């Protein structure tokens, strides 16, 4: 499913909640932004690269994480990277190429 998702799949979800299972607890990640990274330069790329930015209430370490959202037909296993601390929250990013 991941290879079929585009930025258009996520733009309507900006501002909504995704859920991550972390240490036995359900953690809310709010999608704050969906942004195009660059135009596809080669025909081998099936989509334009994009990033998703989430706001998390706690530090999420870099790695593959299992996320769910009510609007998506199945859970996503995506690689998240912490990029910034904002007060008591953290911004994490997922890049799709």
Language model region names:
Residues 1-7:
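Mixed-charge, Lys/Arg-rich low-complexity intrinsically disordered regions
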Residues 7, 12-15:
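A glycine-biased structural micro-motif
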Residues 14-16, 25-27, 46-50, 61-63, ...:
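A generic structural signal for short beta-strands and their flanking turns/coil linkers
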Residues 21-30, 69-76:
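Short coil-to-beta-strand transition motifs
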Residues 31-33, 80:
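Conserved hydrophobic positions within beta-strands
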Residues 35-40, 84-88:
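Short, conserved beta-turn/loop elements at beta-strand boundaries and strand-helix junctions
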Residues 39-71:
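Acidic, aromatic-enriched beta-alpha/helix-loop junctions
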Residues 64-97:
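Short, compact, well-ordered microdomains
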């Amino acid at each position: 499913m991941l290879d079929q998702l585009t930025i258009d799949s996520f733009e309507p979800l900006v501002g909504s909640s995704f859920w991550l299972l972390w240490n036995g607890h359900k953690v809310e990640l709010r999608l704050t932004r969906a942004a195009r990274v660059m135009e596809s330069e080669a025909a081998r790329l099936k989509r334009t690269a994009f990033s998703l930015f989430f706001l998390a209430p706690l530090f999420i370490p870099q790695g593959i994480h299992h996320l769910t959202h009510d609007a998506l037909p199945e859970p996503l296993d995506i690689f998240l990277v912490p990029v910034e601390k904002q007060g008591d929250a953290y911004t994490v990013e997922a890049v799709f190429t």
